[in-house]
Amino acid sequence: MAHKKAGGSSRNGRDSEAKRLGVKVYGSELIPAGSIIVRQRGTKFHAGENVGQGKDHTLFAKVDGYVEFTVKGAQQRKTVNVVPYTGVDGE
């Protein structure tokens, strides 16, 4: 008689979905207001000029413009700014 003994159960075998975090728009790229610049856990990047921060620490553009990454202060904080886009005449 072909029988198979009961196999043991495993407590492993699970994995969480990737959260798709990281920089979405890089330096000197032109973006519209409301666009997500960085998705992050905590404040790896800090909001600078014309950049807002969501409750999950997501950074987004408040105005149309060019993205700029800078390092500031004694703590060497990485800051994200958006330099406003003024149009063809004002450049």
Swiss-Prot record:
According to its UniProt record, which protein family does this protein belong to? Belongs to the bacterial ribosomal protein bL27 family.
A single cellular component GO annotation: cytosolic large ribosomal subunit
Q: HAMAP family under this entry? A: Ribosomal_bL27 (MF_00539)
Q: Which domain of life is it from?
A: Bacteria
A Pfam family reported for this protein in Swiss-Prot or TrEMBL: Ribosomal_L27
Q: Name one GO biological process term.
A: translation
What name does this protein carry? Large ribosomal subunit protein bL27
GO MF terms held by the record: structural constituent of ribosome
Q: Which InterPro entries match?
A: Ribosomal_bL27, Ribosomal_bL27_CS
Segments crossing the lipid bilayer = none
Keyword vocabulary terms for this entry: Ribonucleoprotein, Ribosomal protein
